[in-house]
């Protein structure tokens, strides 16, 4: 019994000694990737994710590894996860579009209201953190302008300072809204990617439901409802149906 306990603690201590920190795993994974050892690099990146870390760079590199290994569904999944953290990254968007070119389903999106599209384009032109910095800058400018309004040497200067302070307030609130909206979007689990080579979308949440259409690996969808192991989905072109949870992975 004592020998068994000793062996247990010996193995436990040995595992702690051999355990790599996330920083060491990151460096090792990057080195492996640069040597085109994509499968080994992938395992190191996954260990970092399993330890609880999440970042745009980590998801981006995971997407790259899966793409190099020709796992298109997983590649798109991780590019989409990275995109939720930084919607303005051009390299990320280019890689995502490249991966989508390898997906069999070519779905035409239903165009949104032009004003909504315009606002979203502005919102996603910067990351959530960048919008937070902008908000702080605008609020700081507002505070300085209000001081100038209070202690300005002339009525004209005070009037200009007041209007500029109000403009800074509005811009600060807008930047704060964009930052919070992106954070809220990241917290949502309402989109998913098909992981199976072929998946059937049915008219009802069971295998006996009528087959409506077929989806292939890498296709993105919005999740509307869940019943048991089935999820009601909507595609970018407006088509809806039920798909088994086993065939998809939430972004």
Please tell me what each predicted stretch does.
Residues 22-23, 39, 55-57, 90:
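Helix-start (N-cap) detector for alpha-helical repeat units in TPR-like alpha-solenoids
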Residues 108-150:
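Membrane-embedded alpha-helical segments of integral membrane proteins
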Residues 158-181:
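Internal/C-terminal transmembrane anchor helices
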């Amino acid at each position: 019994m004592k020998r068994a306990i000793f062996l247990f603690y010996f193995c436990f201590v040995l595992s702690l000694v051999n355990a790599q920190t996330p920083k060491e795993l990151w460096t090792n994974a990057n080195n492996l990737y640069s040597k085109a050892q994509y499968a080994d690099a992938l395992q190191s990146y996954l260990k970092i994710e399993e330890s609880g870390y999440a970042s745009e760079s980590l998801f981006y590199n995971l997407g790259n590894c899966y793409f190099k290994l020709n796992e298109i569904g997983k590649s798109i999944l991780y590019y989409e996860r990275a995109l939720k953290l930084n919607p303005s990254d051009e390299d990320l968007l280019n890689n995502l579009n490249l991966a989508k070119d390898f997906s069999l389903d070519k779905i035409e999106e239903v165009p949104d209201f032009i004003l909504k599209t315009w606002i979203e384009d502005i919102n996603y032109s910067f990351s959530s953190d960048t919008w937070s910095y902008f908000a702080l800058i605008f609020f700081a400018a507002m505070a300085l302008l209000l001081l100038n309004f209070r202690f300005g040497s002339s009525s004209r200067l005070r009037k200009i300072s007041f209007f500029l302070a109000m403009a800074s307030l509005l811009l600060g609130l807008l930047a704060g809204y964009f930052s919070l909206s992106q954070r809220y979007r990241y917290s949502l689990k309402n989109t998913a990617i098909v992981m199976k080579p072929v998946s059937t979308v049915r008219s009802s949440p069971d295998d006996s439901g009528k087959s409506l259409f077929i989806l292939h690996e890498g296709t993105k969808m919005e999740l509307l409802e869940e019943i048991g192991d089935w999820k009601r989905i909507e595609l970018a072109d407006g088509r809806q149906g039920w798909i088994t949870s086993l065939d998809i992975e939430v972004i």
